[in-house]
Swiss-Prot record:
The gene is metE. Disulfide bonds: none annotated. L-homocysteine binds at I442, G443, S444, E495, D610. The lineage of its organism: Bacteria, Pseudomonadati, Pseudomonadota, Betaproteobacteria, Burkholderiales. This is 5-methyltetrahydropteroyltriglutamate--homocysteine methyltransferase. Its cofactor is Zn(2+). The keyword Methyltransferase applies.
Length: 764
């Protein structure tokens, strides 16, 4: 019998029950006990579904109220002083929420902890804050209580915890200025490891046999000091009475292979979707009795698995390892939707190509039975059905568009060049006549319940096209008038017609499909529903021109056209796996180029092409960066270079660290870049200062992920810090990101303050 297990299950619920419960608690509409009851019900349902699929150990510890790294940070008692947590007391739920979002039903608001991308995914984690001499202790009981919950329901459990070195690698602190690999962070291990030891001892006391300890940092470029630390750390942790399954994912071990194989752990999980070529070396390097967990089902995409190929890859290793070969998804299933059963509106053909979390576990079970030689006819029938679905997808005429193929064949000859920036900016200033420290927003304005109801009624047919258009026009006019009243310089139309910055465009492009309930967690309670790129991408008609032109007709101030860039659409979609991602991105760039040209022709003088995801697309290994950055930058320029020098091109990036890709950002050659900087206290600007970034830049002056309204003096101080690093004539004033998730009262107060801050700076 082949053991199958799972690294983690989506925590949000099939109907986003967790999101709704958490937000109701934040709003005071639900008690803490009701929230905890929702959590218990979700965990029970998720454990049962995994057990029903044949998972040998259900994962415990993959559930989180906001973020699993934040859960672990609070378990360790690593609460920054500004949150006022009493020394030695258990960390309560509201403290956790204040760390994640700045406020909670109880406790004083405080600046939220930094949030950034989880490796190269579209999930965000809350960054641990580290200080020299920091102390740690077991400060929350949730993990242990959830183990007992699962056991009471009759499940064998496998607790899942972040490994100490990955947790430190992800952490930041002012004293650790050398970045993730700062060796000073390793000095915290002496205080940290006893707490890990205590956790493992307590889990053993609950009857736990295996603990999954996640160390995805092992797939990164590690300094030698960190490699050495792995050996020392796991020599100590191996003394615990539980068996450790060390999990790596998102890439291969590569030059860290010897380090991983030398660790005294009972099992090792590797990602064979991202790095199938490591299988032989890993298997041959195992010690006697050591388990190999093979991550063969893609935990990050939604296509059915080629089980025949997986069987062919695994058969020799199964022969070698026998029962010591375990099967699992490549990584946690956090990154895919919960269940295809909720997709009642996808056509049968496309539905047959897909696999969500529940289906991936079923695939895993089928693969395990086939690998173990199960003689049940249902196994062969299942393999045959899988084979037929893959063949149907390969042969479907829906995938290939001859017109797109023809255009792609000639895209190399399409210009990516614009006039020099100095020439462009002079022309743009003469046309736009903007003041010093011009103010703008990033694009979206609050999406009220009324706006969401409008879109919902229109999509369901309850609202006619003309009634919907009139209602959206009214919303746009209100946003324009509001911005004029506040005194913003470059306006936006507010995007009331858009449910999501990627899904909106996907609905208007050929080659995309959409789920009804394919939600995945992005951060906190924020969920996104990524489109599915299943075929060649083309733009049948203009997508934004009508709304932008209408908004511009209402005001003499410039109104930005708002587009999502090709790399971000790619990164935030589930992308076809039958051609290189680069090819799909170029198809997107050509479609967006047509839209940019049409916006200019409609009188739009400022066009923003958002690329918040360009850094997250970076391969995890630096040796692979150049190839990616070359085509990513080329795709951006392909989408923007069709307009004249008087048209000002903006781009926006958020949740990013720029130091190591600043040259490529400059090569994108946007006239203005707006970035997230407020949570980092403008530290991200150092990259632009050191590089002598040549174009205009708008460093975000307040954090839109927090409901806290910023003080004017604080925003002025942030901009003065920016002006100390960059020429003030090239600085813009703007929020960190779009305002979609904020309420109107806090939005109005924050923007009034932001405009006042800009006026203060001009008067100085």
């Amino acid at each position: 019998m082949t053991i199958i297990h799972n690294l983690g299950f989506p925590r949000i619920g099939a109907q986003r029950e967790l999101k709704r419960a958490v937000e109701a608690y934040w709003a005071g509409r639900q008690t803490a006990e009701a929230l905890h009851e929702t959590g218990r019900a979700l965990r029970a349902a998720h454990w049962q579904r995994q057990a029903d699929a044949g998972v040998a150990f259900v994962p415990v510890g993959d559930f989180a109220w906001y973020d699993h790294i934040l859960e672990w940070t609070t378990l360790l008692g690593a609460v920054p002083a500004r949150f006022g947590h009493p020394e030695g007391k258990p960390v309560d739920l509201d403290t956790l929420f204040r760390m994640g979002r700045g406020r909670a039903p109880s406790g004083k608001p405080a600046a939220a902890c930094e949030m950034t991308k989880w490796f190269d995914t579209n999930y965000h984690y809350i960054v641990p804050e580290l200080t020299p001499g920091q102390t740690f202790r077991v400060a929350r009981e949730d993990l242990f209580e959830q183990v007992k919950e699962a056991q009471a329901l009759g499940h064998r459990v496998k607790p899942v915890i972040p490994g100490p070195l990955t947790w430190l690698w992800l952490g930041k602190g002012d004293a650790f200025a050398q970045g993730a690999g700062d060796i000073g962070k390793l000095q915290l291990l002496d205080a940290l490891l006893p707490v890990y030891g205590e956790v493992l001892e307590r889990l053993a006391g609950l009857g736990v046999e295996w603990v999954q300890i996640d160390e995805p940092a092992l797939v990164l470029d590690l300094p030698q000091a960190w490699r050495d630390a792995y050996q020392a750390v796991y020599a100590k942790l191996a003394a615990s009475p539980v068996k450790l399954l060390l999990a790596t994912y998102f890439d291969g071990l590569k030059d860290n292979l010897a380090t991983a194989l030398a660790l005294p752990v009972a099992g090792l999980h590797v990602d064979l979707v991202r790095a199938p070529d490591q299988l032989s070396d890993v298997a041959s390097g195992l010690r006697p009795g050591q388990v190999l967990s093979a991550g063969v089902i893609n935990g990050r995409n939604i296509w059915r698995t080629d089980l025949d190929a997986a069987l062919a890859m695994l058969a020799p290793v199964r022969e070698q390892l026998q029962e010591r070969l375990w099967l699992a998804p490549s990584c946690s299933l956090l990154h895919v939707p919960v269940d295809l059963a909720g997709e009642t509106e996808l056509d049968a053909e496309l539905l047959g190509w897909l696999s969500f979390a529940v289906q991936k576990l079923d695939e895993l079970c089928l693969l395990g039975k086939a690998l173990g030689g199960d003689a049940d006819p249902a196994v062969q029938q299942g393999l045959a059905a899988q084979r037929a679905a893959l063949q149907a997808r390969r042969q479907s005429p829906r995938i290939h568009n001859p017109a797109v193929a023809q255009r792609m064949a000639g895209q190399a000859g399409v210009s990516r060049e614009r006039a020099p920036f100095g020439q462009r900016i002079a022309r743009q200033q003469s046309e736009l006549r903007l003041p010093a420290f011009p103010t703008t927003t990033i694009g979206s304005f609050p999406q009220t319940a009324e706006i969401r109801a409008l879109r919902r009624d229109w999509k369901s047919g309850a609202l006619t096209d003309s009634a919907y258009e009139n209602a959206i026009r009214k919303e746009i006019e209100e946003v324009i008038r509001f911005q004029e009243k506040v005194g913003l310089d470059v306006l936006v139309h507010g995007e009331p017609e858009r449910n999501d910055m990627v899904e909106y465009f996907g609905e208007l492009l050929a080659g995309f499909a959409f789920t009804k309930n394919g939600w995945v967690q992005s951060y906190g309670s924020r969920c996104v529903k990524p489109p599915i790129i299943f075929g060649d991408v083309a733009r049948p008609a203009p997508m934004t021109v009508g709304w932008s032109a209408y908004a511009q007709s209402l005001t003499d101030k410039p109104v930005k056209g708002m587009l999502t860039g090709p790399v971000t659409i790619l990164q935030w979609s589930f992308v076809r796996d039958d051609q290189p991602r680069e090819a799909t991105c170029r198809q997107l760039a050509l479609a967006l180029r047509d839209e940019v040209v049409d916006l200019e022709a409609a009188g739009i003088r400022v066009i923003q092409i958002d690329e918040p995801a360009i850094r997250e697309g970076l391969p995890l290994r630096r040796a692979d960066w150049r190839a990616y950055l070359d085509w990513a930058v080329d795709c951006f320029r392909l989408s923007t270079a069709g307009v004249g020098e008087a048209t000002q091109i903006h781009t926006h990036m958020c949740y990013s660290e720029f130091n190591d890709i600043i040259e490529s950002i400059a090569a994108m050659d946007a006239d203005v870049i707006t970035i997230e900087t407020s949570r980092s206290n403008m530290e991200l600007l150092k990259a632009f200062e050191d590089f002598h970034y040549p174009n205009d830049i708008g460093p975000g002056v307040y954090d839109i992920h927090s409901p806290n309204v910023p003080e004017v003096d604080w925003m002025v101080e942030l901009m003065r810090k920016a002006a100390a690093r960059l020429p003030k004539e090239r600085l813009w004033v703007n929020p960190d990101c779009g305002l979609k998730t904020r309420a109107w009262p806090e939005t109005e107060a924050a923007l009034i303050g932001m405009v006042q801050a800009a006026r203060t700076l001009r008067a100085a």
